[in-house]
Amino acid sequence: MFEYSKKPKILVIGDLILDQYLWGHSSRISPEAPVPVIDITSKNFSLGGAGNVIRNLNSLGAKVEVVSVLSECSTSKKLKGLLKDLKIKTHLFTQKNHIASKKTRVFSSRSQVLRFDSEDKLDLSSSLEIKIINKISSKIKEFDCVIISDYGKGVISKNISKSIIKISNSFSIKVLVDPKGTDFIKYKDCYLLTPNKKEASEALKIDLEVKNNIKPALLKL
């Protein structure tokens, strides 16, 4: 799709999520409830959500920058540290009293036994939306491509999504979207939309398990 003699410079905009992995083993059942007691022996963290996109692009040699919203919580600090480790240039905005998204997966003897999430969804103020849009507008000409990585956590509001696409298109910069939710209208005029089958089926209200529905679904998209 893209041919470059140099490393492409890509702007990723979206929801940063911290993935935490707890590793351990179990040899007994809790006396409080019929559940295993996991003795944790190690843990590690990685970038999730839009962070996973950043990590993959970085490993492929692209020059990546990110625009997102975090807070002053411990999860946000860990995410910033992981981005710094990858030498990713960041444009991060702060929403006070917000808990950044963290997904914790618990493993016992290499098998996942539990996942629990800690987060609250962002409700961006108009003033913060304007700051984000202005930042993107001031930087957009530097990039070869823009990726919107929407995990439904609030960074990609309808206003921000439409503004990103409009600004990028005005400079003939392609916008690729990994969508979330059923409101695909907010991604109108993007270059490429990449829903999975379940997401497309729910957004279009078309059963994609029926083979004859696939072509009408593509036309509707």
Predicted regions and their residues:
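Gly-rich Lys/Arg/Thr-decorated short loops/hinges at beta-loop-alpha junctions or inter-strand turns
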Residues: 31-38, 109-122, 195-202
